[in-house]
Amino acid sequence: MFNFRSFDTLVDPNNLDETHLFDIIGKVVEIHGVQEREFQGKNVRLIEIVLEDLSGQQLSCTLWGDYVDEILVFEANIKAGPPVIILQLCRGKLFNDKVVLSTSFDTTQIHYLDTIPAIVEFKSQ
């Protein structure tokens, strides 16, 4: 169901293909405040989160548009401990000489249910 990329394969800017969509799983360790920016002549909302893999490596991820509301609802309902999410069909982008993750228009899906086998497995490790 998912085609996960490891954080190790994403952090090297020389290996970045900004056109390739992939899936990533990680623990949400930071959720920053909502921002508004002008993008292609329109005001858009965004929020940055930081994901961490099992080895402690972290990647920043920018969620755009409707994904902002989705992550805020998710954040409000966190019961205990750092949550684990799956970003399905996201992409890597080069920003300030670092690779960051980004949602891809209406294509990306955010999965966060504790019953998803990949999330259960991630949490058990």
Indicate where each model-derived feature is located.
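Single-stranded nucleic acid-binding proteins centered on OB/S1-type folds
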Residues: 1-125
